[in-house]
């Protein structure tokens, strides 16, 4: 069973996007649907992790870049987000707790690349960086 079909069968919600890496699956759900998912099944992340055998990240989509960035990195305890628009390019700097920086960046920068890639699908994002 594919990840999208599995997600939709477990959550009973349509999925907006699914992105996979070696050890992680990122599910992006439609706006205002995350609450419904957790009301029906509070253990949805555990169920998906058990069936897929990879780390699971769920994020709620948004039409607003700031909100989408916060939703995508929510589990890492986002403190601040700075967005610079310059000459048609958008650069984002995210501040997280010092102990979470390694997890946000990921092994060989995989996680931060994945997050930037997902944001770039919805917004004209040039770079995404993490600071203390």
Whereabouts are the PLM-identified features?
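RNA-contacting regions in translation and RNA-metabolism proteins
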Residues: 1-132
């Amino acid at each position: 069973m594919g990840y999208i079909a599995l997600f939709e069968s477990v959550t009973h919600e349509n999925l907006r996007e699914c992105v996979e890496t070696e050890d992680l699956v990122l599910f992006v759900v439609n706006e205002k649907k995350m609450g419904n998912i957790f009301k029906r099944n509070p253990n949805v992340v555990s169920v998906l992790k058990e069936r897929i055998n990879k780390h699971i990240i769920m994020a709620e989509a948004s039409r607003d870049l700031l909100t989408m960035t916060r939703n995508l990195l929510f589990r890492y305890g986002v403190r601040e987000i700075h967005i610079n628009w310059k000459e048609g390019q958008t650069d984002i700097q995210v501040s997280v707790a010092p102990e979470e920086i390694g997890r946000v960046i990921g092994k060989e920068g995989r996680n931060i690349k994945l997050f930037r890639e997902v944001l770039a699908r919805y917004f004209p994002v040039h770079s995404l960086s993490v600071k203390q």
